[in-house]
Amino acid sequence: MPRVGIIMGSDSDLPVMKQAAEILEEFGIDYEITIVSAHRTPDRMFEYAKNAEERGIEVIIAGAGGAAHLPGMVASITHLPVIGVPVKTSTLNGLDSLFSIVQMPGGVPVATVAINNAKNAGILAASILGIKYPEIARKVKEYKERMKREVLEKAQRLEQIGYKEYLNQKE
């Protein structure tokens, strides 16, 4: 049974939203992924949000570009946590999406990550689930420890060989 619902306004958002799916897979978290357009399929959006909990969904990640109404509209229908992913557009580089998602009225919160950063949305969803599921919390902690080790190893390497050699080795 999926614990996370990943939805997007268009299939053009999939290259961004797959990052959330990939990180959830890394944590071993079940998810469903589909297209739900707030503007083109409003009835589908309403039914998706209304019935998500019955399907076992505990967190929804919603990505959208442009007017980006999907995350906010879904949050207005469900009491489940909604994480909004602003998708970069060719017009305003995703700023329109970011502002649309982040500027929600009081009482209808949407947690918002950086433009095109569905990976962080997946990590945030895992952190939320980790409150209830100790195994997921353990995996999130291990992930963050691994990131810490990687940074410390890179810092040590840079300090040992200097920036010129470090950059040469990265090329």
UniProtKB/Swiss-Prot annotation:
* Involved pathway(s): Purine metabolism; IMP biosynthesis via de novo pathway; 5-amino-1-(5-phospho-D-ribosyl)imidazole-4-carboxylate from 5-amino-1-(5-phospho-D-ribosyl)imidazole (N5-CAIR route): step 2/2
Q: Write down the top EC class of this protein.
A: isomerase
Positions that bind substrate: S10, D13, R40
Q: Which UniProt keywords apply?
A: Isomerase, Purine biosynthesis
Query: Which Pfam families does its entry note?
Result: AIRC (PF00731)
Question: Which HAMAP family does this one have?
Answer: PurE_classI (MF_01929)
Q: Which family does it belong to?
A: Belongs to the AIR carboxylase family. Class I subfamily.
Spell out the protein name for this chain. Answer: N5-carboxyaminoimidazole ribonucleotide mutase
